[in-house]
Swiss-Prot record:
Protein name, as recorded: Holliday junction resolvase RecU
Keyword Cell inner membrane: no
Record keywords: Cytoplasm, DNA damage, DNA recombination, DNA repair, Endonuclease, Hydrolase, Magnesium, Metal-binding, Nuclease
Gene designation per UniProt: recU
GO CC terms, sorted: cytoplasm
Gene Ontology biological process: chromosome segregation; DNA recombination; DNA repair
Length: 200
């Protein structure tokens, strides 16, 4: 399937053979991706009436569809309707929350190239309208997950734009962010950090 951005450029996804993974059924479930862990966490928060947070769908314009069988449709070409903003949004304690989730295999830093300008602008707008914007970053080699307020991400982005570092060091994330605790339910307890940082 061919997917294109609004400007007509082709979206190139790394084409690798799909491997069937057996999920580990351990307490930490280290085989789970950050997105899967957050989706499970958000489902827990919703089912226990703690918060209402959902993953935003990526808006696609489908252009070409093949029907190899009557009951099957295969999308062959699609375009991104518009640049996506952040991954998740919702409401907690009457406040709008909006966040991006990112993973890195780097040991010592998080590359700012993992963000796009429109995501930074979106986070600025959320803050300007008194919403809560942040980023959840997972260092997969350490299995450590941090919550970093968007104002810090914006500051590091501005530093990059003025000729500074093109990444956020792990030390800076540890200093300005909060280490999230991981467990069974909720899997990634970011709400307890929101309580400490934004509601105390």
């Amino acid at each position: 399937m061919t997917i294109r951005y609004p400007n007509g450029k082709r979206y190139n996804q790394a084409l690798q053979p799909q491997k069937t993974k057996m999920k580990k059924h351990t307490y930490g479930n280290r085989g789970m991706s950050l997105e899967e862990e957050l989706n499970e966490t958000n489902q827990y928060y919703l089912s226990h009436n703690i918060a209402c947070v959902h993953k935003k769908p990526t808006p696609l314009q489908i252009v070409k569809v093949d029907y190899p069988a009557r009951s099957a449709a295969v999308v062959r070409e699609a375009y991104f309707k518009q640049p996506s903003t952040t991954d998740y949004n919702g409401v907690y304690k009457g406040k709008y929350i909006d966040f991006e989730a990112k993973e890195t295999k780097n040991k010592t830093n998080f590359p700012l190239q993992n963000f796009h300008l429109h995501q930074i602008e979106h986070m600025k707008q959320v803050i300007a309208h008194d919403g809560i914007a942040f980023v959840i970053i997972k260092f997969t080699l350490y299995n450590e997950i941090y919550l970093l307020d968007a104002k810090h991400v914006i500051s590091f982005w501005n530093r990059k734009d003025t000729g500074g570092r093109k990444s956020i060091t792990k030390q800076e994330i540890e200093e300005h962010g909060s280490l999230l605790s991981c467990g069974y339910h909720p899997r990634i307890d970011y709400i307890s950090i929101l309580d400490m940082v934004y509601f105390s």
